[in-house]
């Protein structure tokens, strides 16, 4: 059975799911599975543990689609083949291209180039995610004349050759969901489980194939979607609305009973909720907000946005607010970061970016890594520069700049750094007068 649960954001869909899982755990009903996106799994586990208590692990669990694939593979005894990492997949692609290069019409000349191999591997990933087979590509190519047909034939050959190579003892991670859909009929979890899908806006063809396999096997599947209405709703929910139609059509094709449940939007009793419901609506609404907690403004460009945000933060601090109580949220960090840093510096606003940083960029780690690179790389100038730029080499930034300029001027590398003799070249280059 397919249960479709929909409603706008903050309408209580997830709380309703948690309540149903909690009731099943209290009734000691095993096989409760909450399927969520990979990046949401830890947060969902914490929420479910808080809702269900210590007995959760006996009757329910939180999985992603890849986690479910590992679970079913272990149950059916099909998880022995080691998974290829990215390097192994590139090697398999190179081997596959070597085998079919003479037959390729468009890609043959560039088949040995690393960039082309990487590009074709990305194309294979997309084809597998969309459940496109080599036969389907061949059939489509037969109907497409000229360049497009040749390109599709080449892709069909590459995909078939890649599958043949990876079938020789190793598993491609992009095939996991395809194999999961095939193995669900052999799994007890597929027949007896109660599945709750939350946190998804839409599903790939591979994920839809898994949902179809669960429905066909007789599992109860509850899907949560964030949208306002199944028909004639707001256009911003178009993707989720299309997903709902696809799921309902799939259940109908499988001969599975469906139920649809709507979670109504909560009353617009706060300024933020009014803004949420009316921002993309073509109708107008009035809400009394004496405190003026929300204001909507427009700007000519991104820099003007950042300038207003920085000036507003400064104004709030001058009115008695603390810097740590002010946050600036932006849709895309890479787009806004340069302008935001520039404008905050202009207005004297201290700025801290709450973002993850690469561990290898930390000064101490970078120092150790650069030291190894220097030793193994023959004292290359770039490795030495990376070592000096960590700030832990005992030189000031000005001294580092002077040393780098000298090294670049005289192309010093290798043994020049390790010989006991001092450097005697003039810092100003050839032709400069000698000094003491």
Name each model feature, range by range.
Residues 1-436:
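Polyanion-engaging groove/track-forming segments
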